[in-house]
Structure formats: structure tokens, C-alpha cells
Amino acid sequence: MDETIRWLQGRPYYDGQIAERRVIPGREATFADVDLDSRLVSALESDGVERLYDHQASAVSAVRGGDNVVLATPTASGKSLAYTVPAFERALDERATTLYIAPQVALINDQEETLSDLAHGLGFASGVSVAQYTGRQDRKEKEAIRERQPTVLLTTPDMLHYGIMPHAHRLWDWFFERLETVVIDEVHEYRGVFGSHVAMVFRRLQRICERFDAGDERRSSSRGTGSPGDPDWVCCSATIGNPVDHAATVTGQSPDSFRLVDEDTSATGPTHWLFWNPPEYDAGEGFGSGRRRSSHVETKRLFVDLVARGYQTVAFTRSRQVAERYATDSASDLRDRGEHEAARNVHAYQAALTDERRGEIEDGLDSGEVRGVWSTNALELGVDIGGLDVVLLDGYPGTRMAAFQQGGRAGRGTDPSLVAMVAGEDQLDQYLMAHPRDFFENDPEEAISNPENEHLLPDHVRAAARENWLRSGDDRYFGEPFPDVVADLTEAGDLDRRTTDAGLRWLYDGEGSPQHEMSLRTIGDREVQLRDRRNGNRIATLSFADALRDAHPGAIYHHQGQDFEVVDLDLRNDVADLAPVRPNYYTQVLHDKTITVEEDRREQVLSTHDEVTVRFADVSMRKQITGFERYDRQSGEPIGREALELPETTLDTEALYFTVPGEIEREIRAAGDGPDAFPGAIHAAEHGMISLFPLSFLCDRRDVGGLSTPRHPHTDCATIFVYDGYPGGVGLTERAYETVVDLMGRTLGMLRDCPCESGCPACVQSPHCGNANDPLEKGLAADLLAALVE
């Protein structure tokens, strides 16, 4: 790889783009002896597995002993065997069942094939069988699966919620009575709104297990010490900062019940990492300060060069449209070079492809026939594609966890591999180009979810009552708000309160299926349909708040490679009509926001400044969209503004906030020029802090919002708010409240290191700002943060 990197540095387009180069050394594998059933030994040997890695053996031993397990090792480290071995052992010994849950059907398809092959290797008489139960099967296929009674069932949280738990007593009693193992794959994916929903689903699952006394066979055998209704939980995770705490939060199990296995003992070769920062535009090219050349174009150059050089390469990018476009462009460039065979074997991979097409590309990567792929993060999940020579990251994927997962696809045995991260121009990308140590040496991000979100809890309590009557002790599943929620639902007529010999019980007394009245992926039920005005076909569905932001009259809406203009928004019928256009501009809404502090829940004095108190609170955020701005697509400069009349929205959520001491405010105002200097300083500090949330937590910058004001009625002084962008909050700002000094310090470092003069997309400008990034004072924001934390 050293020679290849030198060759890249000699290419005509090279202009000093390599900002950092590191080599992660390889290692030899370490193994452990595990006593296995002879049938399982034979099946594993037929699959090429002669011994278990030490980390696999540790996990197997822990599950055998009745512990819950978190296995947090990198991509391609063999996590699946850690749960497959005990699952198959229990099926062989006792006909016990295992429930495997993954967030994506593509991963389930891959696991079903792998586990089914291993089960067949055990022989027909073993009684071990594998089946998936997802939305991909029709009614007859699902009936056949239930009649067959597989010992290992693979499903998604959505199907567990909609199709299994509501029928646990009528259709699935045979499964839950023998359930000993629950496997949660990709547990790090259960964060934010989705993670909060799924955490409640798993608490409902635990209630059902208790009703069926799941795990009883294991407890009566020589293995395990579980309590009644308590199957073993095996959680597989990417490398995150809080694997045990997150697994406990998601599953509802005690953190002390989990055994952590996080040392990868599989063999790897050396991985060469390049941080590739595209050059800035020349001053005469019509772009603002700090603007850099496209990461897509830079990635394509590397992709074409490396594929032509014989390296099997995958480029990860964020959107389906980019993957499709640049796969086509890359193949065209290869043909222009005379590389016709390689060009024929370059493809795009994304979730919208059919299962068959995705499988063809996966098999081609595994066999080596496919030479290059442009992919969304769909290939980031644990689908088996073998090892690659090169992985390119077209822009920082948003979290270090995702970057290492994607980069972990590189590596063929112990051969050297290359990972190049090509930076975009936004804050996170440029921060990491300037602070590579933070990427390689800091603790991984934490996964955050909130299973006590009071906006979600009532729907899940209704669903739980529909699945199995409630009792007063169920607050151990649903937390402190449970009694109040039950009282409210009883008063509303959704629950029927009964006194029995065993105590109080609440039965579901509502209409229909509460499970089907909610989605696990969203909060709130009002949606707006976007349709093509030419034919009435639906283009997309947005939540009400998102529709006001993205589908207002005059908005440019981008969907699957096509631009549309919103020509009408009918909020009486919740329908927006769109027409295809080819504009040279994009749009961004303008809005006014106010925040009301409803209740302060926690407070702390800033450790670096004893006159600053940081608080965590319940707040109400009211937003009024007032208009929108048009921006030139090439230069990013504003070219026109229009007013809008849309309804106000209210978000009840959680926030951290802090005030600026009067002395510091006076110093900032004195150092500035004009009345907008201080408002610009606190506004820029707010933007910068929000932009760096994903460095500490697994989230997107749009998951949080902010407000800075020179005088707030609750505090009567200058105040900066940062709030969760979802009703009830998902735990992000609560966790940030606990580490706010680190967040401020990182933001200060970003502002100081950015070479721009007055603010740019790499430091304080935000693509989501409702005030058109005005005013912003980057230098004064740095002075403000320095006064707070230094």
C-alpha cells in the first residue's frame, strides 16, 4: 500500500490533499478450545470453522452460564458465532427456541442463509431449523412457518410489534414457552426515536416472556441461573462508548447482568488510513471563503484510479442518488481508459434495490467478480461480502462508529488494506481533518435512547394491555410515569380497571389494535402526502412539521434524483402538489422561534466558571415559519426571499441552557462592531456546539436544535438553548448537559482552527438555520467560549 499511496500523490490531481496518514497494525488471531456437541463440530468444520476465536469462546461461555452478553467488536470479527453456538446447543439439547431481532430485512436475509446452512449441516434429525418472519412473506407463508415451529426465528422489531406479540397467546405460545435466548443484532442502531420505541417494545416482550415463564427449561438444566420469565439476552454492537449501558437501556435488563466482550481476537492485516481533504476553490471561482471542491468528484477520481490499478473498491456515500450517479460516471471513466471488463463490474448498491439484485452484488463482491461498488450505508450492516482491498468514504459518514464500520469492510485476511476518508466542507468533516487524534484516539460515541419518553409511553402501555393485562408492579418495565399513564388511559376509556383476588388488573378496553395505530420510526401521527401533480402519484410522505419545513409553497424538493417545486400545500387535506423542475437554486425556510422553560429538572455550576449555571429542563419550543430564501446552487449566495403564512407549531421537549454573565457580555460587545456583534457571537457559538453533537453521540445534527437570544424572559439575560428535536426528547441534550464543558471546549477548538475569516460551512454556518445564518460572529464566538471554559 505504501507504493500505491506514493502513486496517488503523483497523480495530476494531487494538490496536497492528504491531511493525515496512519497505519493501524494487523494482529494474529488467538483461539480458545470450546467443548461442543460433535454434530455442531462437524457442521462448523464443513463451514470452514475449525476453532473459535477467544472472544467468541468468551461470549459462548458467558451465555452458557446464564449471563446476558454484549459483544462489541468490529465488523467481520465473527460476532454471529457467539450467539449461534448457544442457540443451536439449546435447540439440540432441549428444543429450546431463539428469537433473533435485527433492524433491517437485508441483514435478516443474510443471517437466515448462513444459519440455515449451518443447521442443515447438523443433519435432518437434529430438530434445529431456521426461519425468518418479516413483512416480506405473505399470509400463507407465515402460516407455514408457524406450523413448522422453527427453533430459531429471525424478525425485525416492527414485525415483533405488529405481527408476533399481539398474537403471542393464540399463535405463538409454542415459541414463547420454549424461548431461552433473545439476540439483538446491531443494538447500536436502536437510538433516538426508533431506539426509544424499540426499548418499549422489548419491555413488552419481557412481560410476555414472564407470562410464559420463558427460559424455564434452561433454569432446570445444568446451565444458567436466570429468574422466571427471563431468557438470556445477547446484544451485538459496533464499537460504541457505552455498550453495556445502552444494551441495558434498550432491553430493560440490569447493567450488572451483562458481561461485556469487546476485545477482537480475529486476525487482521495492517490498515492504511488516509484523511483526504479536497482543496479550496480559488478566490476567482465565485465561491465564498472556506468553500472546498466536491468530495464526490475527489472520491470518484480515487475510485477510478484504484479500480483500474486492480483493487476491489467500495465507496460509501450518503445518498442513493449519488451512489447511482457516480457508479455510472465511474464506469464511463473506466471505459474511456480502455478498462472495459472493470467498467462492466462497477455497480451501485442501495436499499431500494430488489433482494435478488442486492444478493447478486454481494455474491460478486465475495467472489471477486465485482470490482467496484458505490454504496449507501446499506453495506455498512453485517452483510457478508468478504474482504475488500480499498474502502473510500465519500464524506465523513456522521459518526466515528459508522466510519470504522464502513472502513472495517477493508481487509482480506492478513493482507494490507486502504481506507481513505474524503472530507466534505461541513463542520464535522473539517474538524476531523484538523483534529485527527480525536478520530483515532478519543472514546467512541455513545448511543442514546429514552424508554421513558412520555409522548411515546401511553401508546406502548395500551399495546402492552392488549397483549397481557397490566398490574401495578409493571412500573418496573415502564418507569415512574406508569401509574399516571394508566390513570389517564383508564379515565379516557382505553383501560378497564378490575379488582381480582391477585390484586388490581387493567385490561385493554379500546377499539382496534393499538399496535397498528403507531409507527416505531416516528413520533406523532399527522402526515402530509407529497404527490406529482401530473398524475397524482405519491412521491413521499412527511410528518406535519417536516412538511412545513420542506414542502411549503415554492420549496424545491429533491427526490430520487429529480427536483420538484411545491406548487400547492393543502393543509385541510394534508396534501402537497409538486411539479418537476430543473432549478439553478435551492431553498431554505426562515423562521422565528421562542422557547418557554416549563420546569428546570437539573442544574450545575460550570466547572470552569463559577458564575455560569447550566440547566437541564422541560421546555416548549414554538416555531413560526415566516418565509424562505433561495440560494444559488453553485456559489451558495442568496438570490431572493419570499414570505409565507403557515401555522405555528409547538414542540414539547428537553433542553440544556446556560446564561452569559454580564461582564463577559460587556467585553464581547466592546470588542465587536455594531449592535449585531454580541447576538452574532452567541448565535455562532450555538451553531458550533450543535454541529459537534455527533462527535460524542450517535445522532444527526438535525436531531437537535438551538436558540440564542440576548435576553430571555425566563433568565432575564443572554441565554443559549440546545434542545432535542423530538417530542418528549430522546436523551441527547440530557447526556450533553453532563458533558457540556467538553462540548464547549471542542467547539472552541473548531472555531480557532478554521482558517476562514468570518465564518463558513466548516465552522459556524448551518444549512438548517432559520435565520439565514445572520448574524454570525465567529471570532467573537471563540472569545465567548474561551471566557467560559479557559
Predicted regions and their residues:
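Conserved SF1/SF2 helicase motif Ia
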Residues: 88-111, 126, 209-214, 227-229
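Helicase-associated low-complexity/disordered flanking segments
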Residues: 1-57, 67-68
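Post-DEXD/H (motif II) to motif III coupling segment of the RecA-like Helicase ATP-binding lobe
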Residues: 188-219, 223-264
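Conserved strand-helix element at the start of the C-terminal RecA-like helicase core
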Residues: 98-111, 303-333
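Conserved interdomain linker/interface between the two RecA-like ATPase lobes of SF2 helicase motors
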Residues: 232, 240-251, 255-319, 461
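Conserved SF2 helicase motif VI
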Residues: 398-419
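Extended Lys/Arg-rich polyanion-binding regions
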Residues: 417-419, 425-442, 450, 460-472, ...
